[in-house]
Amino acid sequence: MLTADGRAIIDTLPQDLHFIPKAKATKDYFEIIKEEKELDWAYFSPALQMNPSITIGRTGKYRLGTDYPVLDDEGNNMLSVEDVAVVIADEVENPKHHQIRFTAGY
C-alpha cells in the first residue's frame, strides 16, 4: 500500500523489522502481477494492523480501498484475521476487483 504522498509504506519502515523481507517479497510479486493484462487477477493487501491479537472477531463490517490504507476515525488501519477471511470470501463469491490491488479496514 501507499502513503498519502504515494510512497510504498514498506519503504518507509525501519528495514530491520522481522517481517520486512517477506513484505518486500510480496511487494515485488505485486509489481510483477500488475503488468499482467490477460489474466483477471485481484491482489489483496492486508491491513497494517492485522494479527491474532486483534480480538474484535468476525464482524463482517469492513470498508474496502485500493492503494491506500482504509483508516478508522482514530487513524488506524486495522482488520481482524476473521474479517480478512470474510473479505476474501466475499471477493471470491462476488468479484469487485479486476486487475487491481485492494485492501480493507474498519
Question: Which residues are covered by each model-predicted region?
Answer:
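Oxidoreductase cofactor-interface core, primarily capturing Rossmann-like NAD(P)-dependent enzymes
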Residues: 1-106
